[in-house]
A protein has these predicted regions:
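Phosphate-binding active sites in nucleotide-utilizing proteins
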Residues: 2-3, 14-21
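Hydrophobic positions on the alpha1 helix immediately C-terminal to the Walker A/P-loop
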Residues: 3-4, 8, 34
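Active-site signature of alpha/beta-hydrolase-fold catalytic machinery across serine-
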Residues: 7, 11, 141
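Switch II (G3) loop of P-loop NTPases
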Residues: 19-30, 39-81
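Short, glycine/polar-rich helix-capping loops at beta-to-alpha or helix-loop-helix junctions
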Residues: 29-32, 137
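Conserved catalytic-core segment of NTP-binding enzymes
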Residues: 51-60, 76-181
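Short, charged, intrinsically disordered terminal tails
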Residues: 176-193
């Protein structure tokens, strides 16, 4: 999720926006070289906070165009953490909430994740690790079977070229390309025998 937050930040920086990423992850030290390199390269402000009040103070005093909150990760069955996230998100007047899921997850797991995080008023999904699976039918299934749009696709480690807006055309192209790839055809035959 943290890498995804920075990829999203880079999109806005390239559009000449002043961006801040605020980490609310209490379980991890963010003083790592990847974050330092990214903030130096793109000019993204990076801060850590522990509460809504700290977040609001950071946003109000920073003069940024966009603040991206990188919340602590939690599993779909961690009800107390989901409730904490819900309580946090409800305090904001203007907040767009994206749920980050992996393309390599099974459909049932993504549907369960969407259901369990629905109390957060999630507006869309960001699908990561698109490059790590050859079975992208999950993108179509999620699009048809959940009320959420897929907003972004993450297809690799590059902050700029491997993160894009998810359009219906792009999703359809990826699914159709998947079915025509020789490796996919071989694995599909093996799975059906």
């Amino acid at each position: 999720k943290t890498t995804t937050a920075f990829k999203l930040a880079s999109k806005y920086v390239l559009a000449s926006k002043k961006v801040m990423v605020v980490s609310l992850d209490k379980n991890r030290s963010h003083a790592n070289s990847q974050i330092t390199a990214f903030t130096n390269q793109y000019g993204v402000i990076f801060k850590e906070a522990e509460s809504y009040l700290e977040c609001m103070e950071l946003v109000e005093t920073s003069g940024v165009d966009l603040a991206i909150f990188d919340t602590q990760g939690c599993g779909q069955y961690d009800w107390s953490e989901i409730e904490s996230l819900r309580a946090f998100t409800q305090q904001f007047e203007f907040l767009e909430t994206h749920l980050v899921v992996s393309a390599s997850m099974k459909d049932v797991d993504i549907f369960g994740t969407v259901q369990h995080f629905s109390s957060l008023n999630v507006q869309s999904l960001i699908v990561t690790k698109v490059d790590e699976t050859i079975s992208l039918g999950v993108l179509a299934n999620v699009s048809f079977k959940t009320p959420l749009l897929i907003s972004y696709l993450s297809t690799g480690p590059s902050f700029q070229k491997d993160f894009s807006v998810a359009t219906p055309k792009e999703i359809a192209k990826r699914i159709l390309m998947e079915h025509n790839q020789q490796e996919y055809q071989v694995l599909r035959r093996l799975a059906n025998t």
